[in-house]
C-alpha cells in the first residue's frame, strides 16, 4: 500500500489515532501462572483459542507491552504499528471501492449494507419481507430479512419451521457481516437454479440479521476499527462497552466472561442488560416455530455447537456431532477449507452467557456458532468472497436441520388426509387459485388435478 493511496483515502499515516503505539505480538504461554499473569493485563486476545502451549496473538498498548517484557514471557512482535496496520486496511477498502468490483468483493458500511438489503427485499416482495428486530442502545435499527416462498397447499408460510441466522454481535468482525448478507441475498438469487436452496426456502422461514450490534459496527467505520463490544458507557460517561455474546441469560456470569468493564468479554451488569440482546430475545420468544439458529463470527475456521459454559456434553450431543460433520463437509466442498468442529467449550474456549447456549438451553433451538475464515478480525477484501461462498453452504445445512416433511394433500393441516381435503382442493382448482398450481408452471390445469389425486391417494408420509 503506497503512501499516495493512503493520503488519497484521507487516512492517518503518521501514527495518529486510537492504536498509536500499539502492537500485536505472538507468544506461547506454558504454565497457568504465565497465562494468568498475561490475562491480568486485560489484553485483547486476537487468537480465539488462548491455550497453554499453543501460539496466541495479543493486541497490546505500550504499557501492556512493557509489562509483558517485565513478566519475562518470550514473544515476537508481528505487527509493529497497529495504527498503521489499521490505516492500511482502510486504504485497501477505499481502493477497492474505487474499482469496479461486485458488492461482495469489498466491505460495506452500514448505509451501503442497509441499501443492499432493502434492494433485495424490493426485488422479491413475494419471497422477502423486511423484519425489524428492535433498536440498539443508540437507537439504530436492528433489521433483517425474512425469506420464505409464498404459501403452498399443505405448506403455508405461517406453519413452516423457522431458522435464524445472525452476524456481527462483535462489531469488528466484518467478514461475518458480509457473509450473512450474502446468504440472505443468494437464497433469493439461487432459488430458481439450486434445488437445495429452493427446497429450504419452500419449507422454512429463514430470518437473516446481518448486524446484531449496529452501534458497534458503525463505530468500527471510524477510528476504532478493532472495537468489539456495544457502545455502553458507565455512569461517568466513559465508553467501555458490553460483549453482547456474554450477555445472554443462560449460565450468565460464569467461566469465560468478565465482570471488569475494561475486559473484552465484559458481560454487563446483568443478563440481558443490553437492548440489543433484549431485542433478539423478544423476537425469539415471539416466534416459537424457531428450530435452528447460527451465530456467525470471525475468525478461526470452526463449526461449534453447545455448550460454551461447560465441558459437559448436551443431551443432543449425538445429533450435534453428526450435524457438525455434515455442515463442515458442505463448507469444505466449496473451497477445500477444513473447519474444526465440536462443542464451544472444548473447540474454542470456555464462554458463558453466549447466544448459542441460551437459544438451545432455554428455548430448545438447535443452535451453532460459526467462526469463519480469515487472518484475524480484519482480513483483506480478497478473503470476503471465499468466506461468503463457503459460509453459504454451511448455513444452508443449518437451515436444513429444521426442515420437516410436507404433506401437500393435507389441505386443512389437521394431520389427516380425508375427503374434506379433497373438497378444499377442488374448490381451489375450480377457482383457479394459485395454491392449486402443484407443478409450479404458473397455470392451474388438469395436470395439477391429477397430481393432487396421486398425493391424496398416497396420504401423508
What does each model-identified segment do?
Residues 1-4:
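Positively charged n-region of N-terminal signal peptides that target proteins for export
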Residues 411-433, 440-461:
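Alpha-helical segments with a strong preference for the paired helices of cellulosomal dockerin domains
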Amino acid at each position: 500500500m503506497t503512501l499516495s493511496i493512503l493520503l488519497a483515502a484521507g487516512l492517518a499515516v503518521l501514527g495518529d489515532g486510537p492504536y498509536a503505539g500499539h502492537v500485536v505480538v505472538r507468544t506461547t504461554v506454558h504454565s497457568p501462572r504465565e497465562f494468568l499473569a498475561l490475562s491480568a493485563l486485560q489484553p485483547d486476545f486476537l487468537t480465539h483459542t488462548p491455550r497453554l502451549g499453543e501460539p496466541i496473538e495479543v493486541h497490546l498498548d505500550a504499557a501492556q507491552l512493557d509489562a509483558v517484557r517485565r513478566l519475562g514471557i518470550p514473544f515476537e512482535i508481528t505487527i509493529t504499528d497497529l495504527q498503521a496496520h489499521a490505516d492500511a486496511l482502510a486504504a485497501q477498502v477505499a481502493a477497492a471501492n474505487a474499482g469496479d468490483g461486485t458488492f461482495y468483493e469489498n466491505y460495506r458500511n452500514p448505509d451501503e449494507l442497509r441499501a443492499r438489503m432493502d434492494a433485495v427485499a424490493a426485488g422479491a416482495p413475494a419471497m422477502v419481507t423486511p423484519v425489524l428486530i428492535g433498536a440498539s442502545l443508540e437507537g439504530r435499527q436492528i433489521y433483517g430479512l425474512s425469506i420464505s416462498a409464498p404459501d403452498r397447499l399443505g405448506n403455508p408460510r405461517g406453519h413452516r419451521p423457522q431458522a435464524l441466522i445472525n452476524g456481527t454481535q462483535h462489531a469488528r468482525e466484518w467478514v461475518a457481516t458480509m457473509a450473512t448478507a450474502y446468504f440472505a441475498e443468494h437464497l433469493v438469487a439461487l432459488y430458481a437454479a439450486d434445488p437445495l436452496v429452493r427446497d429450504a426456502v419452500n419449507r422454512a422461514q429463514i430470518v437473516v440479521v446481518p448486524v446484531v450490534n449496529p452501534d458497534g459496527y458503525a463505530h468500527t467505520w471510524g477510528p476504532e476499527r478493532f472495537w468489539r463490544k456495544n457502545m455502553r458507557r458507565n455512569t461517568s460517561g466513559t465508553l467501555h462497552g458490553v460483549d453482547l455474546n456474554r450477555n445472554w441469560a443462560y449460565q450468565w456470569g460464569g467461566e469465560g466472561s468478565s465482570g471488569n468493564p475494561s475486559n473484552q468479554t465484559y458481560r454487563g451488569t446483568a443478563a440481558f442488560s443490553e437492548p440489543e440482546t433484549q431485542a433478539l430475545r423478544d423476537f425469539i420468544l415471539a416466534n416459537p416455530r424457531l428450530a435452528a439458529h447460527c451465530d456467525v463470527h470471525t475468525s478461526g475456521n470452526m463449526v461449534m455447537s453447545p455448550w460454551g459454559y461447560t465441558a459437559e456434553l448436551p443431551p443432543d450431543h449425538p445429533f450435534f456431532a453428526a450435524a457438525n460433520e455434515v455442515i463442515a463437509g458442505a463448507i469444505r466442498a466449496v473451497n477445500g477449507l477444513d473447519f474444526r468442529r465440536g462443542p464451544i467449550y472444548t473447540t474454542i474456549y470456555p464462554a458463558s452467557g453466549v447466544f448459542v447456549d441460551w437459544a438451545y438451553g432455554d428455548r430448545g433451538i438447535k443452535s451453532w456458532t460459526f467462526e469463519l475464515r480469515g487472518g484475524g478480525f480484519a482480513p483483506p477484501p480478497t478473503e470476503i468472497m471465499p468466506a461468503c461462498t463457503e459460509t453459504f453452504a454451511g448455513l444452508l445445512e443449518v437451515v436444513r436441520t429444521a426442515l420437516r416433511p410436507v404433506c401437500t394433500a393435507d389441505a386443512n393441516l389437521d394431520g389427516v388426509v380425508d375427503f374434506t381435503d379433497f373438497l378444499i382442493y377442488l374448490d381451489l382448482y375450480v377457482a383457479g387459485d394459485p395454491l392449486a398450481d402443484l407443478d409450479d408452471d404458473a397455470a392451474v390445469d388438469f395436470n395439477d388435478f391429477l397430481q393432487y389425486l396421486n398425493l391424496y391417494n398416497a396420504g401423508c408420509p
